[in-house]
Amino acid sequence: MPQTIASPPTPEYDLEEVAARLDEGGVDLGDPASVDRCAALLGGLARNRDFLADRLVADLKAAHAGQLAANRYSAQVVLLHRSRRGHFLRANIWPSASDEAYRTSGARAFSYGVPHDHNFHFLTAGYWGPGYVSDYYDYDAEAVDGRRGEPLNLRFVERSSLGEGRMLLYRAHRDVHSQLPPERLSVSLNIMDEGEHVPWRDQYLVDLGTDAARWGTIASRPTLTPTEALLRCAVHLTDNARDIADHMAVSHPVPRVRASAIAALAAVADGTGRTAALERGLRDADARVRDDCERWLTL
C-alpha cells in the first residue's frame, strides 16, 4: 500500500509559497530527499485552513465576471498550480454517497469502485473531512508483463481512510487501491510527479469482482496518448498517416504505441489485410503487443 509519511512539524504555508518552492527545487518522488522536502511543503499547506476556500471563492467570482481564462475544474479536481518542470499541485473533492454530485454523476466519475494503480508517484494529504476509504493492495511490477487478464498476485494490506492530517506516498506500479466514498464530503491535496515519461507508461485497472478466475487480474490499460488517438483517426484520412503507422508499428520504443499503430492499420484493412496486419504483431518482442494482437484476431 502507499507509504505512510509522517507530517513534519512545519509552519503553515500559503499556496503561492508552496508553488514557488516546488518550482525552485523540483519534484522527484522517487528520491527520499525530495519526498521529505515535498512532505514538509504539503504538510504546511494542509495546515492552512483558509487557502482553498479563498481560492474557490476568488475563482467563482472571476468566472461570474467572465474573467476566468481557463477552467480548472472537472468533476472533482481543482488544479492549484502546474509547473513547467513537470509536476503539479491539485485538490481533489470526494463526495459522499449522499451528496448530489455523487447521485448525479455516479460512482465511477469519482473513481469509486474502480480498482487501479498509478503510472506516476504522488504525495497526498487529507485536508478536510474524514477522507475517502480505500482497500489497499500491492504487487511486484517486475513480475508482470502487463497483459490483459494477467494475474497481479495482489497482496492485501488494509482498509483505511485518508483523514485530515494523514499523508501517503503512492508509488507508481506498486500500490493498488479500490476507493469507496467518505462518510461526508472530503478534500485531499496532492503533489503529482508527472514528467514527460509518464504518458508512455501503462496504468492498470484491476478486476476485483466476484469472478474468482478473474479476481486480481489486469482488466484494462486505460492510458492513451494524444499521438495514439490522432494516429487511429488519421489513418482513415490519408495514406501518409498509414505510412507513419507502418513505421511506428515496427520502430516505436513503447510497446503500447506499437500495438496502437497495428490496430490503426488493421482498422483500415479488409479481410486478409486485417489478418496480416494483426499477425505481424504476433512477432513483436513484447508480450503485451502479442497478446493484444492475438485477442484482436478473435474479434
PLM regions with names:
Residues 60-64, 91-118, 171-173:
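Conserved short histidine dyad/triad with adjacent acidic residue
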Residues 38, 226-233, 258-264, 292-294:
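Conserved hydrophobic register position within alpha-solenoid helical repeats
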Residues 195-240:
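Charged, amphipathic alpha-helical linkers/stalks
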Residues 8-98:
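A short, N-terminal "cap"/entry segment at the start of jelly-roll beta-barrel domains
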